[in-house]
């Protein structure tokens, strides 16, 4: 009968619609769970990267301090400092070989005036900009400082020159530049960017991100207020979990800001084959269910055969 055919067709349609809703709900639930898993993974990666960054800074500081202790214990260097002649001090540094390749050396008088500097931005007779911070760090037992010098971030350590009483103080600075950022990236799988801000003036940006991205990174790191909490954001069409670490412990207008970025899209790509397989299976199940519903609906509508 026609009403029976219409009823069974409606039942088949309702069942197909319900199945479609269930399949879609399961698919989007899996998709949401995948996104959350990737975000959690990125959060763990970001936290691990922050710890790696701190340990790498500590390791660099210890190495720097070891080299500085070796330098200040060198007799020819102490004699050159006692004489107070910049040329003799530089000659002793060249013979010693410490601090002339990847680090900068600052020999300071007890009054905080620069005697010798391998950084051209600081000249003899000039007051060292972080002299008070060095004194405060020494009193408080702080092993290293993170400062902004000549528009660049530096990791700074210090040691006195004694002969036998203190006659000078030597500071040695390790630049946090592209090489350091690349090393941190290789250890943490994070994108890393550094910028120094001194008295409100930003310095040069050092970043592992492509050059086309660096202008927007520098602009973001120069914001007057920095939120240190990790945030999800869209950056040049790609999703990142980002965190800004404000560094600098001198309280005299110098600050170093570090941007750590954990890419989400790259992690999501690893789940893309699983999503496609699940979607294909769901479509096959839906098509089979529709075909089965149509088949049984046709069987139910077939007229009964009369007995022979």
Regions found by a protein language model. Give the residues of each.
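Short hydrophobic alpha-helical segments used for membrane anchoring or interfacial signaling
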Residues: 105-112, 191-199
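Extracytoplasmic/periplasmic sensor domains and loops in membrane signaling proteins
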Residues: 83-92, 98-101, 113, 117-148, ...
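Juxtamembrane extracytoplasmic/periplasmic/luminal helical "stalk" adjacent to the first N-terminal
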Residues: 7-13, 18-83, 100-103, 145, ...
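Short, hydrophobic beta-strand elements of compact beta-sandwich sensory domains
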Residues: 166-175, 242-271
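Membrane-proximal low-complexity regions enriched in glycine and acidic/polar residues
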Residues: 154-155, 162-194
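Cytoplasm-proximal transmembrane signaling helix
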Residues: 264-308
């Amino acid at each position: 009968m026609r009403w029976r055919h219409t009823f069974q067709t409606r039942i088949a349609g309702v069942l197909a619609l319900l199945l479609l809703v269930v399949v879609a709900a399961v698919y989007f639930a899996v998709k949401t769970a995948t996104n959350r898993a990737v975000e959690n993974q990125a959060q763990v990666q970001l936290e691990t990267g922050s710890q790696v960054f701190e340990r790498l800074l500590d390791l660099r500081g210890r190495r720097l301090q070891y080299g500085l202790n070796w330098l200040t214990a060198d007799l020819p260097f102490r004699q050159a400092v006692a004489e107070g002649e910049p040329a003799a001090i530089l000659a002793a540094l060249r013979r010693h070989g410490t601090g002339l390749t990847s680090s900068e050396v600052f020999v300071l008088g007890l009054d905080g005036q620069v005697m010798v500097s391998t950084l051209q931005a600081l000249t003899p007779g000039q007051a060292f900009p972080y002299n008070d911070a060095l004194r405060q760090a020494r009193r408080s037992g702080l092993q290293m400082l993170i400062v902004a010098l000549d528009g660049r971030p530096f990791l700074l350590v210090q040691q006195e020159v004694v002969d036998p009483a203190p006659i000078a103080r030597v500071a040695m600075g390790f630049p946090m530049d592209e090489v350091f950022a690349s090393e941190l990236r290789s250890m943490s799988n994070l994108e890393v960017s550094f910028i120094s801000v001194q008295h409100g003036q930003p310095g040069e940006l050092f970043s592992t991100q492509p050059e086309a991205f660096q202008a927007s990174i520098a602009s973001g790191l120069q914001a007057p207020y920095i939120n240190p909490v990790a945030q999800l954001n869209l950056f040049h069409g790609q999703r990142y979990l980002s965190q800004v670490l404000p560094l600098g412990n001198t309280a005299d207008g110098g600050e170093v800001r570090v941007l750590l970025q954990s890419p989400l899209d790259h992690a999501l790509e690893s789940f893309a084959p699983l999503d496609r397989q699940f979607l294909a299976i769901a479509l096959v199940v839906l098509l089979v269910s529709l075909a089965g519903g149509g088949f049984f609906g046709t069987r139910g509508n077939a007229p009964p055969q009369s007995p022979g």
